[in-house]
Amino acid sequence: MVSAWCSIALALLLALHEGKGQAAATLEQPASAPKGRGPHLRFRRCSCNSWLDKECVYFCHLDIIWVNTAGQTAPYGLGNPPRRRRRSLPKRCECSTAGDSACATFCHRRHWPEAVVAPSSQAPAAVLKTGKMWTAEGDLLRKLRDISATKLRFARLQPEVTRKAIPAYSRWRKR
C-alpha cells in the first residue's frame, strides 16, 4: 500500500513539474518583447504653469486618465514640475516643440475683453466688446479706465430719481 501511495505521489510530482515548466516557458516569451520598447512615456504637448488650470492640463497632457470624483475632475498620471520653473514663467504654459503653432497660440495668448470708449448716450453694458487679444499690460489698465469714465458720464446724464420723503415719525405705534 505504501508503494502505491509513493507511485501516485511521484506521478503527481512529475505531472506538476512538467506543467510548471510549460507555463514558465510560455510566460517568458511575452516578457522578453517589452524589454525592447522601454518604459511607458507620457506624451506632453506643453508644460502648464499651474495645475489648477484644468483647460491647460487637458490641452497639454495628451496621455492622461481623467477620473470624475464627487467635487472635481482630477487628472492622474501627472508629474510635479519644479516650482522654480513655474514661478519664472509668466505665461500660461511652455510648448515642448517650438514649431507647434496650435500650442504657441494656446500658451501665449491673453484674452481680455476689449473696452471701447462709447458715446455718453450708450449704456455701459453696450460698451464692452469681447474677442480681441491684448499683448501689453498697459492696454488693460487704459481700457479699464475708459470703461470707468464711460460709466461716470452715463450716470451723470441719467435723470435723478426723485424719492418720496419718508416721515421721521411712524404712523403706527409699536405696542
Swiss-Prot record:
Localization, UniProt: Secreted
Check the record and name the Pfam families matching this protein: Endothelin
Disulfide-bonded cysteines: 46-60, 48-56
Q: Which residues form the propeptide?
A: 22-43, 67-175
* Statement: the UniProt record of this protein carries the keyword Transmembrane: no
Q: Which domain of life is it from?
A: Eukaryota
Family statement: Belongs to the endothelin/sarafotoxin family.
| Cited function | Vasoconstrictor.
Q: What is this protein called?
A: Endothelin-2
Q: Which organism is it from?
A: Mus musculus
Q: Which gene encodes it?
A: Edn2
